Every structure is written in C-alpha cells, then in structure tokens.
Amino acid sequence: MSKTPIPCIVGFGGVTPAGRASHNLSHTRITYGLESEQNKKDYIKSVLSLCNMADEIGESQSFDKFAADKEHEVLKNTLVRKIDKEFIKEKFWCYDYDLPANGGGQLPFRLNPTEYYASRQHPKALGMAVMGIADAFSDCGFDVRKTIDKYGRDKSGCFAGCAVMNMDKFSGDGLMSSYPMGKRASSKTISFTLPEMTADFINAYVTGSLGISGHFIGACATSQYNMNAGVELIKSGKSELVIVGASEAIIMPPAFIGFDAMGAMTTDKRLKDLQTLLGEGEELDYTKYCRPFGDNAGLVVLSLIH
C-alpha cells in the first residue's frame, strides 16, 4: 500500500461578483431561478451581510422581511452588470478614464474589502484576499489556526496571487502614474504590485505560516496552477495543510487599455453590434456582457478571490 499522502479539499471560499463562494453561495446566484426558496433566502441574506447592509433594518422589521424586500436590489447588484464607475474611480483609480467597456464583474453593490479590517492603503486585491481566506475558513468545519499550530507552522503552505499584477492606485497604477502626474510614489507601491503578494499577506496577516509558499502564474488557469502546486506539496510530505487560490482586481484603466489593445475584450461597441445582429435591440444589456456559449463579443474583466 502506498504511503503517499492523499490531498483532500477540506473547505473553499472567496469573494466574487456573485458574493461569497463558501457554502456554494456564489453558485446559488448563478442558478438562482432553479433554487429552493430556502436557498434563495440564504443567498440574499449572505449578500446583505457581506455588504454590511443589515444596519438598514428598521426597528420593527425582521431580517427575513428585510431580505425579501431587498431581493430585486441584490440580484440587480450582483454578477456581470454595468460598472459603478464613480465608486471605483473614487476608491481605486489614479485618474479618470473614458472606458471602451462599461460592463464587468464588479463585487456586489459597492463592496470594498479593505474597509473591513485595519488596512493601510492596501490594494483591493489584497483586501479581497484577507476577506476571501476568512470566508474559506468558515467553510472548513474546524479551527484552521489550531490545526496549523498542531502540525507546526513550517508544515503550512500557501500558493496564491494574481495573473497580471495588482494595479490600483495603491499598487501598480499608483507607481507608474505618479511621476507623469507630478505626484510622489509611495514606498509601498512597488512591493504591493508583486503578483505573489496575496500569499505573503495570507501568511503574515492570517495564518502566521512559516512553510513553503509562492505563486504560479497561468493567465486564466492561475488558480489551477496553484492548486497543482499545493497537491504536490502535500504528496511530498513537506506540508500538511496548503492554502491555494487566486485574487484578481483588474477593473482598472491599465487592464482595460491592455485587453482592448489585444482586441480580446468585450466593449460597448462590440456588444451593440452583437445585439443588432441577434435582434436584441439597441439599448445595451450589460448583464449579457459575458456570453461564454455561442455568439459573443470577447472576454469580460472582473474582480474575484477564490
């Protein structure tokens, strides 16, 4: 009998345009019309809690009634939709930019993960990583930190990061635009730009891990590459527990400029041409920006951590 350890997934989580990934909540949003009433109710509550909207509940109103009243609003402010440009520009951009594409996978409502912990000008992707790992821990069914302490911190690994780079005003975009705009670059921006900073943050802020960590970049397959690295680390016996994933926050001008130059991205013009071709009218339906099957207009940018 082989003595090679068998890797097992013991929990998963994250934050996506559909909300929390743990407990299959994001999947519930995708299949919302086919879900049971209880699953729908649980999903709506999860988004309202995630976005800290429970404070809006009236004194004589129950959470169930509040969630029922907010159902349409939650569905409207999740998944791919028209980007809330004013919010993203204020929070994450260095300069205004006339977007060729105004649809994308923005996090639910105006969710800003960096406001949920003591961040110090942290890029959005790193804030998403902290929120995402907390969500994953809630899905495990056991105390992850105690397990890490039991195995030893040198036996806990982490492979996570982004495919492009961290590119908001607190990272890559802030670094590269500071000099042309007559501003001073922060001493943090170049380090926050590094793709593997997600793994570094999880180790430093969450797990206190001293084990093997790193990051493999593979475009759309980045999380899969990191998963493979984690599997091999456990099989080798070098780690007992490994955190793997990816964190992307690329609803930023540099990403739009790059993907548009490639001719690979869905734009308002391409969507309008496609809608005309399919007889769907001239008013742009931003919820149909992403069409993975059949006729489509290209890729769609989004923010997610998983």
Regions found by a protein language model. Give the residues of each.
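Glycine- and other small-residue-rich loops at beta-strand/loop junctions that grip anionic moieties
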Residues: 191, 216-219
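Short low-complexity, flexible loop/linker segments enriched in glycine and/or proline
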Residues: 256-260
